[in-house]
Regions:
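Hydrophobic transmembrane alpha-helices of multi-pass solute transporters/permeases
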Residues: 1-451
Length: 451
């Protein structure tokens, strides 16, 4: 209830304003943002690898299908939340709008606690995040100290961390880290894409707030515009399932990689931001009218907010194409022991994109003295900011397209790339196979021992 200390939260039934100093309001506000970010970041990074444990032996087609429907369910829940809670906050009571997520969070914690035995069943893996950073640090340190003597027989700079090259980590740990670092270019190109997605709660939000929200006597909630970006994802997932079966994974040799989805999704995001720029120019051509929002009278454009729907739709199409494909590549292109770490890095770079979006907004506001990102949209040139971001996104798309071929080999077994020299692991797997074969012979009377 006190997460976001707006004034109407502190009005009781007698309409008496509860005095809370601005300093305390800021403390509560930033503390709430910190706890929310920690919770959301942890859930988004951990839940998906836990759910995908049952699919570790499946191929890329089944994995992409899983991630498609996983994010489909997530966005279906988001659509319900945006429609219901946003209406309650804007038209009924903002206090109740904050209380509902609080109660839902408590129920989710109780449910996870009750089901923890079913969710956490994987033994501790050999590789951890500290091991990954340790391999990178050891390689850099060894390379700097003994560069003259070790550079001749090393094909990759991370090989300096191997024990036979003067490092302190085994070959399996180093090779796992190498497979993870190959994904860093993929993660890096998602930063600017995530910056475009973050325009929904920033630039797109301001556009909607400064447009006509009245529709047949009903005030349309601003947050409900997010549903327009979710609807394309809910529609496209079943269509993409058919495309995946018929074209994308038709065969190991002639099929295409999901990187084509990422390229098309990045193009859709760039078009979305470009359309937002043209929509801003179009919005200014309408006369201004007064509109009451949260008990404040604002001068807004008389353009209906639904004219902004195309930019939301394009961004929804981008999310439907990019997010599941990136999750598939992050999960499939690394060995089993570090798949959770790979998903965590994907979430980390997505978070970096959110910070990049905030940085762009602050820089545009300060660098242009409020002209590119103004407080009052009719007095500034917000469209220039959108066109600048769209041009950056186009360059980002071309950059990813040039390296997309690196992530096409989804049918390779990345756990066997470096298994040839690991005799211990081979013997362990051979022992398991012998035990399984012996158990089959003992339990099946139709088999007779070979002489």
């Amino acid at each position: 209830v006190v997460s976001f200390p707006f004034e109407d939260i502190y009005i009781d039934r007698r309409h008496v304003l509860h005095t809370l100093p601005k300093r305390e309001q800021k403390i509560v506000f930033y503390f709430a943002l910190l706890t929310a970010s920690l919770g959301i970041g942890g859930i988004r990074a951990i839940v998906c690898p836990l759910s995908a444990y049952n699919l570790e032996d499946c191929g890329p087609k089944e994995l992409l299908s899983f991630f498609n429907w996983f994010y489909w369910l997530v966005n279906l829940n988001s659509a319900v939340v945006f429609v219901s809670i946003s209406y309650i906050q804007q038209s009924v009571a903002r206090n109740l709008g904050f209380l509902i997520p609080f109660v839902s969070g408590i129920m989710a914690i109780i449910t996870i606690h009750m089901m923890r035995g079913e969710m956490i069943y994987k033994p501790k893996a050999e590789s951890s995040l500290l091991t990954t950073f340790g391999v990178i640090g050891s390689a850099l340190r060894t390379r700097c100290v003994r560069h003259r003597y070790l550079s001749a027989g090393v094909t990759n700079w991370l090989d300096h961390a191997k024990e036979n090259h003067g490092g302190q980590y085994s070959e399996i740990q180093v090779e796992s880290t190498k497979s993870l670092t190959r994904l860093f270019p993929l993660f890096t190109f998602q930063i600017l894409y995530r910056t475009c997605v973050m325009q929904i709660p920033s630039g797109y939000y301001l556009q909607t707030m400064n447009s006509n929200l009245h529709f047949s006597g009903f005030v349309f909630p601003i947050a409900a515009m997010n549903v327009i970006s979710i609807v394309p994802l809910l529609i496209l997932v079943p269509v993409l399932e058919c495309i995946n079966s018929s074209c994308l994974f038709s065969s190991k040799d002639t099929g295409h990689s999901p990187t084509i989805y990422i390229v098309v999704g990045h193009l859709s995001a760039a078009l979305s931001v470009m359309v937002a720029g043209f929509s801003e120019i179009h919005r200014k051509h309408f006369p201004q009218v007064e509109q009451t929002l949260s008990e404040e009278v604002l001068l807004v454009s008389s353009m209906p907010c639904f004219h902004l729907a195309p930019q939301y739709i394009l961004l929804g199409v981008a999310e439907a194409l990019v997010t599941p494909s990136c999750a598939l590549l992050s999960f499939r292109l690394v060995p089993e022991r570090i798949r959770g770490i790979s998903m965590h890095f994907l979430a980390l770079f997505n978070g970096a994109g959110c910070f990049m979006g905030a940085f762009f907004v602050q820089t545009a506001h300060a660098g242009t003295q409020g002209n590119w990102f103004p407080h009052l949209l009719h007095e500034g040139k917000l469209e220039r900011f959108f066109f600048f971001l769209a041009s950056l996104m186009m360059v980002n798309t071309l950059g990813f397209w040039t390296i997309a071929h690196r992530y096409n080999k989804l049918h390779e077994d990345y756990t066997s790339e470096f298994r040839g020299s690991l005799s211990g692991e081979k013997l362990l797997k051979h022992g398991k196979a012998v035990k399984h074969y012996d158990s089959v012979l003992e339990s099946s009377p139709i088999f007779s021992p070979m002489k």
